[in-house]
Amino acid sequence: MAIYKQITAEQVEALCSGFYAGVDEVGRGPLVGDVVTAAVVLDPNNPIEGLNDSKKLSEKKRDALYEEILAKALDVSVGRCSPLEIDELNILHATMLAMQRAVAGLRARPDRVLIDGNRVPDFTDETLEGHAVIKGDGLIPAISAASIVAKVVRDREMEALDERYPEYGFAKHKGYPTKAHFEALEAHGVLAEHRKSFRPVKERLEAC
């Protein structure tokens, strides 16, 4: 796993040429559920307007862009790591593994992979060119698209989990460590879907 410093605007422009994939993750901070990553290859001949960091978009806008990405992108792949894998590996290494899985799931090998953040996972294909771009989800459209796909996929999984366990409020807080989530943990206990290595969950288990 390599660590990279911020690249320049000129470098960003150069990287966004040719057949490349953008990669981003969602769900490192929550106490429950998978960490989800996405890899997206956009079609330069079929642009998508309004792409941005998923956190800066409304849910309605994200959902609309998600459908447009699936319809227009050349390739979309989702990778994930389960709570069990997160507990075994730690969240950083689980995120890197999920990114590896997303890239491996692409139908065609890209010329390079551009990843939001300052780390690049060790790809199985050692010849694959990888670049970390700090705040890339707001700079590079393919990374923005990946952030939107990962966010919508994970949010919908939290909504499905909320249907199974409405007392935890997952549809509202999406599994993040909010006051409501802490209160639900205290009142109802730890679920199989919780990340047992995360401190609030671990402390609740130890208190039993």
From Swiss-Prot:
Subcellular location per the Swiss-Prot or TrEMBL entry: Cytoplasm
Cofactor(s) required, per the database record: Mn(2+); Mg(2+)
EC supergroup of this enzyme: hydrolase
InterPro entries hit by this protein: RNase_HII (IPR022898), RNase_HII/HIII (IPR001352), RNase_HII/HIII_dom (IPR024567), RNaseH-like_sf (IPR012337), RNaseH_sf (IPR036397)
Residues noted as binding a divalent metal cation in the record, renumbered to the chain: D24, E25, D116
Pfam families reported in the protein's UniProt record: RNase_HII
The encoding gene: rnhB
This protein's name: Ribonuclease HII
Every RNase H type-2 domain range: 18-208
Xref: Gene3D superfamilies: Ribonuclease H-like superfamily/Ribonuclease H (3.30.420.10)
HAMAP family in alphabetical order: RNase_HII_B
Molecular function per GO: manganese ion binding; RNA binding; RNA-DNA hybrid ribonuclease activity
GO biological process: DNA replication, removal of RNA primer; mismatch repair
Homology family: Belongs to the RNase HII family.
